[in-house]
Amino acid sequence: QELSRRISTATGIKATTSLTAVVDALRVLGIKRPAIATSYLADIDARLVDVLQQSGFRVAGIRGMGLKRSIDMGKVMPEETYRLACAVARAATDADGIFISCGNLRSFEAIEPLEKDTGLPVVTSNQAGLWQALRMAGVQERLPNLGLLLRDY
């Protein structure tokens, strides 16, 4: 959030980051205990948990794919992302939402099925970034098929 503020101050233009958008999306959906699916290695997952805890969230569970290279993250099919997110949500029985972290994961196709099958709201890095960029640009149009966040907020 500090980076976004510094960019905005220096340029006079609204700015955001993926993580700022995610935090705002989790808050607007009322998610306090996310179950998190990532493409990352354990050390990156641990840093993500720290940042989210510092932002007031209690991470209900996290599971990563253990991928190192961005190119490999981009090759993950949405069905794999769906399965991982379902598994971490099932394991984290007190989760009140799902967060899929990684801008390289093809997660858009998994959002609606996850929300339907788990009954939990879903936030992904790319979905949150799109949502925040649209709202910052003054676009209020609701988008179907991309989950509760873009459909209702």
Q: Residues of each region from the PLM?
A:
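Non-catalytic structural scaffold of enzyme domains
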Residues: 1-153
